[in-house]
Each structure stands twice: as C-alpha cells, then as structure tokens.
UniProtKB/Swiss-Prot annotation:
Family, as annotated: Belongs to the aldolase class II family. MtnB subfamily.
Cofactor(s) in the UniProt record: Zn(2+)
Pathway stated in the Swiss-Prot or TrEMBL entry: Amino-acid biosynthesis; L-methionine biosynthesis via salvage pathway; L-methionine from S-methyl-5-thio-alpha-D-ribose 1-phosphate: step 2/6
Name this protein carries in UniProt: Methylthioribulose-1-phosphate dehydratase
GO process annotations (BP): L-methionine salvage from methylthioadenosine; monosaccharide metabolic process
Catalytic activity: 5-(methylsulfanyl)-D-ribulose 1-phosphate = 5-methylsulfanyl-2,3-dioxopentyl phosphate + H2O
One annotated GO molecular function: zinc ion binding
Function: Catalyzes the dehydration of methylthioribulose-1-phosphate (MTRu-1-P) into 2,3-diketo-5-methylthiopentyl-1-phosphate (DK-MTP-1-P).
Example of a GO cellular component annotation carried by this entry: cytoplasm
Binding site for Zn(2+): H107, H109
Enzyme Commission code(s) on record: 4.2.1.109
The keyword Ligase is assigned to this record: no
C-alpha cells in the first residue's frame, strides 16, 4: 500500500498559524472601527526571511478564519495555498524586500483616510507639524518636527505605484502613505509599531480635517 506524501512547505506552517491568529485579532478590531468596509483592506506580517503572511483577497475582515491568511514569497507569489493573495500584495512585499527590519504592513480604508486623501491629492502630501502625537512615530522624540505623509495617485497597476513609492523612499523616510480616493498604508518593525503608526496617523488626519472645517475650508 502506497502512502500519500504531503509536499513539505518552504516555511514553518505552525508559525503561519500563529501569525494568522495574531493578525486576525488586530484586523477584527480595525473592522469594528469601520476601517475595512466591504471586504477592503489587506494586512501582512513577515513570516521568515523569504515569506510573508498576508490576507486572502476579498475576505470579510469582520469574520476572518485561519485559512484566510496565506503565505506568499517576496515577489508576491502564493506559496502552499490555493487561494489568491490581496491584489495589492506587491505594495506589501516591496517594503519587506527593501527593509529587512520591517515586520508588519497594514492597509486600511477608514473614512478619515479616504477623505484626507481626496482633500490633499492636489498637494501630493499632508504636512503634520507640532503635534505631540508625532512622537508616536519611530525615531521622533519631540513634537517640534514635521512629518510629510505622501498622497499617491490611485492606479490599478501595482508595479507603477510600487515604483513611485520606491522613488520617494529613496528621498525621504516614511512611516506610511495615502492613495487618492483609496486608503492608507502604514508599517513598522512589529505589529505593535505598525498599529501605533496607523492609529497616530488616523488621529492626526482627523485633526487636520477638523481644522479645515473650523477655518471654513470644508
């Protein structure tokens, strides 16, 4: 009698399961906050030197299961999983390739992020200045600083968008960016770091929009 052989995976399957549960808990909180409407948004965590754990495309972020987190290589190709990764996987993997220290990338679609991306699309960036919460970003120890958040044009061609992000990363340090009419990407060395950057940007963008309303610009 011949035994059925299961092909070995090039990554630690138990580690993928561990990361799946870690991500699902956080994603569920974002979904409850309304930051992942209509199955939008995607999230990832470095699995090992050559692989990333990332959400499967088109899943409702309010009720993810372990099988909704899959592995891809650093070129964005599915590994050991029959499903399709997020359509924007390349925007995740480019960061993991470029920065070996990055451990987590978060992409959300909150109302605040989307409106801010539309308001500041013409300028191409949002300048956040003199906020105490700027100290939430890695490397910032004072409020007396300015953080520029880029706003990129939306496109369905992820190669073009990834190239634009890479070009700007050559010129400035970034903790996140907006895509016009779309949402926001943030990242960090750990999930906690990435989440802190996301929450800080969400709050500061809300502040900027409220200031525009108070001044009669919106």
């Amino acid at each position: 009698m011949n035994a059925t052989c299961t092909p070995s995976l090039p990554y630690d399957a138990s580690r993928l399961r561990e990361l799946a549960h870690l991500l699902i808990g956080t994603i569920s909180e974002f979904a409850q906050a309304g930051w992942t409407p209509a199955t939008s948004s995607n999230f990832s965590h470095r699995l090992d030197e050559h692989h990333v754990a990332i959400t499967v495309s088109g899943r409702d972020k309010r009720c993810l299961r372990e099988e909704d987190i899959m592995a891809v290589d650093l070129d964005g190709n599915a590994v050991g999983h029959p499903h399709t990764p997020s359509a924007e996987t390349l925007l995740h993997t480019q960061l993991y390739r470029r920065f070996p220290e990055i451990g987590c990338v978060l992409h959300t679609h909150s109302l605040t992020q989307t409106v801010a991306s539309r308001v500041y699309a013409g300028a191409g960036h949002i300048s956040l200045k003199d906020y105490e919460l700027l100290k939430a970003f890695a490397g910032h120890s004072t409020h007396e600083t300015t953080l520029d958040v880029p706003v990129f044009c939306n496109t369905q061609n992820m190669n073009i968008l990834a190239a634009q992000v890479d070009t700007l990363l050559d010129k400035q340090r970034m903790w996140g960016y907006l895509i016009n009419g779309h949402g926001m990407y943030t990242w960090g060395n750990t999930l906690a770091d990435a989440r802190r950057h996301l929450e800080a940007l969400e709050f500061l963008l809300h502040c900027e929009l409220d200031l525009l309303k108070l001044r009669g610009y919106l």
